[in-house]
């Protein structure tokens, strides 16, 4: 998506995905578009995500992401990693 890939960025993405899995989102993908972090989860889990939105946003900002978004299309395994 035009975002330069670095080991530091990959480590932050991995940390965010692992943390979300620990919070009860077993199917999750984080995608980075510049300053935007796009979170993909199963659509069935959207209400759980919204209930935890403040906690999730705080954690993702702690990891260094600026703008945190939930992808309205849900998890899609066929798109690019970053």
Question: Model regions: which residues?
Answer:
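ATP/NTP-dependent adenylation/nucleotidyl-transfer catalytic domains that generate, transfer
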Residues: 1-82
């Amino acid at each position: 998506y035009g975002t330069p890939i670095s080991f530091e960025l990959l480590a932050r993405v991995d940390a965010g995905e692992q943390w979300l899995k620990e919070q009860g989102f077993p199917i999750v993908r984080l995608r980075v578009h510049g300053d935007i972090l796009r979170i993909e989860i199963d659509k069935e889990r959207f209400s759980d995500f919204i209930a935890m939105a403040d906690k999730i946003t705080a954690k993702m900002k702690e990891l260094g992401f600026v703008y945190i978004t939930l992808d309205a299309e849900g998890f899609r395994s066929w798109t690019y990693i970053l």
